[in-house]
From Swiss-Prot:
Protein name stated in the entry: Esterase AAEL000016
Polar residues: compositionally biased ranges: 7-16
Organism per entry: Aedes aegypti (Yellowfever mosquito)
Annotated EC: 3.1.2.-
Ranges for region Disordered: 1-21, 253-275
Entries under InterPro entries matching the protein: AB_hydrolase_fold, FSH-like_dom, LovG
Acidic residues composition-biased segments: 266-275
GO cellular component: cytoplasm; nucleus
TM helices/strands, residue ranges: none
Family: Belongs to the LovG family.
Length: 275
């Protein structure tokens, strides 16, 4: 009898805490090649204002320093502000259109974003250019249970499929989560056909095009699309949290009415049920 009472008290003393609803989405934002987190944040000032009611962006800087540009003077030192998520050429550089190359440093970047994702408790992904390529890979890895990152949605601007050999099998199954794909009709760095090919790896991609080049647009003509996308994502996110809270509450009730007490508690347990 004493053993049963002790077990019951132990169960009730550490109930599963309810998850506090988040008022905004928390989105991990991945910059492009030769960018960094601070620079990307600065470039997205207008975009952040558009979505500020519904979402907060968490910017992270890639761990690898990109080498000097090919036309740099001899002896030029690498700029620590120019970063890369990985390198897909044997000379230690990156080019989105390169095919059948390596993915040097990819695992280091994967570990970094997994760490930040967990620390910041993010729920969605956003990426630009190489960062959007990375987002596409993360979505696929998540679907196959190969990363701790579990995005509810993704936003990919000027994205493309990775041409690295180790990533070629990442696009065999379509990604199921909601996605918004943004690209410029006049993009000469990542042609729109490459962004369209990445969008085709998702089951129901939402497409937003603009007449410009290689950038994430944030003009009045795009505002409504952004607002509606993130408002809908927030609604689904909050509904999921409510279900999670209800499930946790039901679990606590089941514990409180376990076999030791059959729903009747001793006086010694009153402090556990004060709330």
């Amino acid at each position: 009898m004493m053993a049963n009472e002790t077990a019951a008290k132990s169960t009730k003393s550490s109930p599963t805490p309810a998850v506090e609803p988040e008022s905004k989405l928390k989105i991990l934002a991945l910059h492009g090649y030769r960018q960094n987190g601070d620079g990307f944040k600065s470039k997205l000032g207008s975009f952040r204002k558009f979505i500020g009611k519904h979402a907060e962006l968490v910017f992270v800087t890639a761990p690898h320093i990109a080498p000097p540009l090919p036309d740099s003077e001899a002896g030029t030192e690498p700029d620590p502000a120019q970063r890369s998520w990985w390198f897909n050429k044997d000379d230690g550089t990156f080019k989105g259109t390169n095919k059948n190359g390596p993915a040097i440093g990819f695992e280091d970047s994967l570990k970094l974003v997994e760490k930040v994702w967990k620390q910041e408790q993010c729920c969605g992904l956003l990426g630009f250019s190489q960062g959007a390529c990375f987002v596409g890979l993360l979505c696929d890895l998540s679907a196959r249970g190969m990363t701790s990152i579990k995005p509810e949605f993704a936003v990919l601007s000027s994205g493309f499929r990775s041409g690295s050999l180790v990533h070629l099998n990442c696009y065999e199954t379509k990604v199921q989560i909601p996605s918004l794909h943004i690209y410029g009709e006049a993009d000469e760095i990542i042609p729109k056909e490459m962004s369209m090919a990445l969008a085709d790896t998702f089951t129901d991609p939402q497409i937003l095009t603009h007449p410009g080049g290689h950038f994430l647009p944030a003009q009045a003509s795009q505002k409504q699309t952004y607002v509606e996308f993130f408002r809908e994502r927030l609604q689904f996110h909050l509904e999921a949290q409510e279900i999670e809270n209800a499930t946790a509450a039901n679990s606590i009730l089941v514990d409180d009415s376990g076999p030791a007490g059959n729903g009747v508690h001793d006086d010694d347990d009153d402090d556990d049920d004060s709330d």
